[in-house]
Amino acid sequence: MRKGLTLVEVLVTLVIMGIAFAALLTSQLANLRASAQARFATDAKAAAVQVLERRSAEVLKSEIVPALSPYKDAPLDPDNPSGNWRSFYFVDYYFSCPTRVAPSPKQRGGSVANLRPGLTCSGTETIFGIPVAWDIRGENGILGEGVVTVVVTATHPRGPKVTLGRRVTCYDVYPSPTQDQPAPCPPPGGGRP
């Protein structure tokens, strides 16, 4: 009667254990890869959100200008049109991006010269080492009247790509409970051609 294991039995046991450990290792590596890709996608989304918020805030920005400014949109005091006015960057972006077109005659005198010069409609920023391309466009047609679309695409160097968009309307800029058509909104039929 023999005691112990034969060499063949030991080798078979080692092969079975090796296969089990290889399967476990492969599973762990797949999980690590998936976790890393998810983290990269999260980083890309964080960068995209940061640029989207910054560009949206630029479109929503307004400032106080004197009555003689070509950029005036709405008087601060309707009873005193020679006083200060509010100027909405929304109007500039809507009629300048992607190409400059004349605003409606009721806005900025209908002149391209009354739109702020030098607005950038697209570009690329790098956030956390992730390049983020952005694009601002005034929509055209009846469904696009008074709508500016901001789209950003972040592409992580290690793979994931995230695209986010936001539609900013003239009502986001100047929500007026007393007017059907607040100052930054083009009049019906007065949007981009």
Swiss-Prot record:
Disruption-associated phenotype: Mutants have a wild-type piliation phenotype but are deficient in transformation.
Major subcellular site: membrane
Matching InterPro entries: N_methyl_site, Pilin-like
Residues with the N-methylleucine modification: 5
Primary role: Plays an essential role in natural DNA transformation but is not required for pilus biogenesis.
Propeptide: 1-4
Organism: Thermus thermophilus (strain ATCC BAA-163 / DSM 7039 / HB27)
Protein name: Pilin-like protein PilA2
Transmembrane segments: 5-25
Sorted UniProt keywords: Cell inner membrane, Cell membrane, Cell outer membrane, Membrane, Methylation, Periplasm, Transmembrane, Transmembrane helix
Disulfide-linked positions: none
